[in-house]
UniProtKB/Swiss-Prot annotation:
Keywords: Amino-acid biosynthesis, Branched-chain amino acid biosynthesis, Cytoplasm, Leucine biosynthesis, Magnesium, Manganese, Metal-binding, NAD, Oxidoreductase. It is found in: Cytoplasm. It catalyses: (2R,3S)-3-isopropylmalate + NAD(+) = 4-methyl-2-oxopentanoate + CO2 + NADH. Mg(2+) binds at residues 222, 246, 250. This is 3-isopropylmalate dehydrogenase. The gene is leuB. It comes from Burkholderia mallei (strain ATCC 23344).
Length: 355
């Protein structure tokens, strides 16, 4: 099994190194091949997604990704910025389903900004459609307004759109995920205002006829954002579009106490996927050895579970992470009084020891 390792920028190389350390500690061997991406890709080839990196990603069985982005690239034209690498990988690999778990570990309940009784036992899975919606809809751009009260003035415009096949395939992924959990699926939209959202809801209802054992409900996105802060444990699996999912998954991540704990998976139709921590490249702490590697280590566990069909090995890593937290090890972002505060490498070593 071949894994493409794309560390990226900022803290990416540090945290990916710890995930690789954990993979190498398992009792089976994987072929790991590394390549530059993001700002590192731009420095190496003049493009954030070099041709050789894309070829490796296509050839591999799965991709372990760190993070991309750095302030020093903000002046580049949009097509050359590091963040375009992840968008390019999603497009070229046809990764359309993003899984973002939001789990509050018992040992970290006090780190959440919400009261312990609201988040104790929290375990949400957000399934976000990645390839459509207003992020990719055409036409888009800046022009002279052709009509309206400010006709002739400069305006920016984007297009929100979804095709039926796009909605159906993410619906099936979400229903199947819900079927493996509590058999409850919440679809989030804005169908009281947006035609695209009403269409989304209609297709979700139609697909639900194939999953009689799963309870489908609906919620407007503004209410969902409020309910995530008010009573988050009411949710189990949430499915939504690209933009709403982008926002809600970041909100849900902070319920857990630290975005440094949260993995994610982006999958294609055949469960080949790209696995990355939910956080960014954090250039302000890069090279200091203090970044939390647990989200990346847990992303490696998701990689084993979904793309390589190694559920037992994934379980081992997840149990090791829980054991390390139980032993009191903490990086700075999740530190509590009386804990054993450690750096990036020491946390990775602790997980390996727990294995």
């Amino acid at each position: 099994m071949k894994i493409a390792v794309l560390p990226g920028d900022g803290i990416g190389p540090e945290i990916v190194n710890e995930a690789v350390k954990v993979l190498n500690a398992l009792d089976e061997k994987f072929e790991l091949e590394q390549a530059p991406v993001g700002g590192a890709g731009y420095e190496a080839s003049g493009h954030p997604l070099p041709d050789a990196t894309l070829a490796l990603a296509k050839e591999a069985d799965a991709i372990l990704f760190g993070a991309v982005g750095d302030w020093k690239y903000d002046s580049l034209e949009r097509a050359l910025r590091p963040e375009q690498a992840i968008l390019g990988l999603r497009k070229h690999l046809e990764l359309f389903a993003n899984f973002r778990p939001a789990i509050c570990y018992p040992q970290l309940v006090d780190a959440s900004p919400l009261k312990p009784e609201l988040v104790a036992g929290l375990d949400i899975l957000i399934v976000r459609e990645l390839n459509g919606d207003i992020y990719f809809g055409q036409p888009r751009g800046v022009r002279a307004a052709p009509d309206g009260p400010f006709a002739g003035a400069r305006e920016g415009f984007d297009t929100m759109r979804y095709s039926e096949p796009e909605v159906r395939r993410i619906a099936h992924v979400a229903f199947q995920a819900a079927r493996k959990r509590a058999k409850k699926l919440l679809s989030v939209d804005k169908s009281n205002v947006l035609e695209t959202s009403q269409f989304w809801r209609d297709v979700m209802i139609d697909v639900s006829k194939e999953y009689a054992d799963v309870e489908l409900s609906h919620m407007y996105v503004d209410n969902a954002a409020m309910q995530l802060a008010k009573a988050p444990k009411q949710f189990d699996v949430i499915v939504t579009g690209n933009m709403f999912g982008d926002i809600l998954s970041d909100e849900a991540s902070m319920l857990t106490g630290s975005i440094g704990m949260l993995p994610s998976a982006s999958l294609d139709q055949r469960n080949k996927g790209l696995y990355e921590p939910s956080h960014g490249s954090a250039p302000d702490i890069a090279g200091k050895g203090i970044a939390n590697p647990l989200a990346t280590i847990l992303s490696a566990a998701m990689l084993l579970r979904y793309s390589l069909n190694r559920a037992e090995q994934a379980d081992r890593i997840e149990r090791a992470v829980k054991a390390v937290l139980e032993q009191g090890y903490r990086t700075g972002d999740i530190a509590t009084p009386g804990c054993k505060q450690v750096g990036t490498a020491a946390m990775g070593d602790a997980v390996v020891a727990a294995l």
